[in-house]
């Protein structure tokens, strides 16, 4: 069956008998849990953040059930504390962390190589190079976890996650007899006070040495003999590129990239004249091979930055003399002007647009966060001035205030991100009395990753409906005295609240609430607007909200000599933000909608 890498990991987890899986959605890993949750006899959940997801998986594994935690690469930063203690404790049942790196930062704020976490934690790292291996190595990861009493890191990358290839399916294997096991009270193993942890450290050091011995015969570490003039060590999707560009070369394909099989690498190196490593991002394998005392080339030839592809590998090889210039594959001629530019933009009817319009109007420093609303930085809204990572907005605003910044700082954060890591930062604002204004943009869903449920709507991954957690009572319980919830599309209400908060010298929270325009309940309300051409004078004010549905018409206003506005009825959702800011009442609902 044709499966994406994410679908294959989900299938592998199900075949391996995984009972519990937890994740926070993040591209390119999101679809793993979405697909796993559709299988029978499993429990799958969206957690508020990746640390909670990993702790959940650890708890399930302590209780004797195989467990999986999935996340994108930066999610493992959030979960790192839990990863490190789990490396010390091990578990009663298999525990696997699937972490998806994002070379070229297609949807991420950085480009880190998470194989280093395996080395840091002294745990094995497996790295599939196609969908079949994604499934098979997931199964192998759970077997490895239980054999050596260790968490296992499954390192994926964007192209493995989202590319499809043929996968041979197997059946589910239920570990044991399937009956629930009582919790095992093993204090020296599971209670990481210093006296116990100091005894566990030698255990994990010996464990990684034992796994290194296994790596020599690990069935997914394979030498593919070829022309001895060139030997290539590679892993992950880079294997596919290596085989395409160097079809006759000798190849060592690594399915376990930590610990590395030192003996197998030496054997392979001795059989070739020139040894190179082709890998995405850091020179992780290359440096380990060099530490073995072997002559090897890697990042001196192939890029350190961005993702690889056959063209990049081929061009790099030509420059290094590994291939003749005749090997260059000419690219088809493309007219750069053949396609119009398509910059990212907030959707028509996005409930965040009005807030950014007001923030731009008020000219205040705005600290952004991770989500659809990051697009508020773009012209013509121009209303985001910092963005770092999940939950950073409130803390960064607080720091700027405490550094003596004379302006009032605003933090904008989405509902899902607030639950992810914004709550501790808001507690800090109250505790250390910082007059930060926080806008929680509540669009009732985790939007950017594909409309996953979260605590604000109570929708579970497997289709259930649990209790909704209300933002306003939560914020008041933290100690914020000035809290207000307004309709996100009500421009006057947003502006009035922000002006009142700017006059205060205390922390304040504004919750702007409206369902994401792409949710079914919002789509039912879509009724397009139109511009009354006779009233429009081309003032361009409506263009400043950056709505894709508002266009420049061919008709010029005689006095202003500017194009009048035109609304695309096929895009307009009828949010009325443009109508509210039009000074001439030139925007109204279409007659057929009334």
Task: List the model feature ranges, each with a label.
Residues 1-131, 159, 225-226, 291-511, 521-522:
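Thiamine diphosphate
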Residues 41-48, 89-100, 179, 185, ...:
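A glycine-rich helix N-cap at a beta->alpha junction
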Residues 35-41, 242-252, 473-479:
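Short helix-loop-beta junction
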């Amino acid at each position: 069956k044709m499966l994406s890498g994410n679908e294959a990991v989900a299938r592998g987890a199900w075949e391996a008998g995984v009972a519990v899986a937890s994740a926070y959605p993040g591209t390119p890993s999101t679809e793993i849990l979405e697909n796993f949750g559709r299988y029978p006899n499993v429990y799958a959940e969206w957690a508020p953040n990746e640390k909670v997801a990993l702790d959940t998986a650890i708890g399930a594994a302590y209780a004797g059930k195989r467990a999986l935690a999935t996340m994108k690469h930066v999610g493992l930063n959030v979960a790192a504390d839990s990863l490190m203690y789990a490396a010390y404790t091990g578990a009663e049942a298999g525990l696997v962390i699937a972490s998806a790196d994002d070379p070229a930062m297609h949807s991420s704020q950085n480009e880190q190589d998470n194989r280093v976490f395996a080395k840091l934690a002294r745990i094995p790292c497996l790295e599939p190079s196609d969908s079949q291996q994604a499934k098979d190595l997931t199964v192998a990861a759970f077997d490895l976890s239980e054999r050596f009493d260790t968490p296992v890191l499954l390192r994926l990358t964007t192209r493995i996650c989202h590319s499809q290839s043929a996968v041979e399916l197997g059946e589910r294997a239920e570990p044991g007899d399937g009956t629930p096991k009582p919790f095992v009270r093993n204090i020296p193993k599971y209670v990481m006070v210093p006296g116990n942890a100091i005894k566990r450290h030698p255990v994990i050091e010996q464990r990684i040495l034992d796994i290194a011995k296994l790596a020599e015969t690990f069935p997914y570490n394979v030498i593919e003999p070829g022309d001895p003039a060139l030997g290539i060590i590679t892993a992950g999707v880079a294997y596919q590129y290596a085989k395409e560009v160097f079809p006759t070369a000798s190849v060592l394909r690594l399915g376990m990239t930590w610990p590395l099989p030192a003996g197998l690498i030496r054997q392979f190196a001795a059989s070739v004249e020139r040894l190179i490593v082709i890998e995405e991002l850091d020179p992780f394998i290359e440096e380990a091979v060099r530490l073995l005392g072997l002559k090897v080339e890697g990042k001196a030839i192939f890029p350190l930055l961005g993702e690889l592809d056959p063209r990049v590998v081929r061009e790099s090889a030509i420059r290094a003399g590994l291939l003749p210039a005749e090997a260059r594959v000419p690219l088809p001629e493309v007219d750069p002007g053949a396609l119009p530019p398509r910059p990212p933009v907030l959707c028509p009817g996005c409930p965040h647009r009005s807030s950014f319009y007001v923030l731009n109007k008020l000219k205040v420093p705005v600290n952004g966060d991770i989500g659809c609303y990051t697009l508020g930085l773009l012209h013509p809204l121009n209303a985001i001035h910092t963005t770092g990572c999940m939950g950073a907005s409130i803390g960064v605003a607080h720091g700027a205030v405490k550094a003596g910044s004379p302006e009032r700082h605003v933090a904008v954060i989405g509902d899902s991100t607030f639950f992810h890591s914004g709550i501790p930062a808001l507690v800090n604002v109250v505790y250390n009395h910082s007059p930060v204004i926080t806008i929680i943009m509540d669009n009732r869903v985790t939007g950017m990753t594909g409309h996953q449920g979260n605590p604000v709507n109570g929708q579970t991954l497997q289709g259930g409906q649990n209790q909704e957690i209300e933002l306003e009572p939560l914020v008041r319980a933290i100690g914020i005295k000035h809290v207000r919830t307004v309709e996100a599309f009500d421009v006057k209400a947003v502006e009035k609240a922000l002006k009142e908060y700017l006059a205060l010298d205390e922390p304040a929270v504004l919750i702007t609430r409206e369902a994401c325009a792409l949710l079914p309940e919002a789509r039912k309300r879509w009724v397009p607007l139109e511009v009354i051409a006779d009233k429009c004078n081309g003032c361009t004010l409506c263009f400043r909200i950056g709505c894709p549905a508002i266009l420049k018409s061919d008709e010029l206003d005689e006095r202003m000599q500017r194009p009048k506005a035109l609304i695309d009825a096929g895009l307009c959702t009828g949010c009325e933000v443009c109508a509210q800011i039009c000074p001439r009442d030139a925007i109204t609902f279409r007659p057929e909608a009334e």
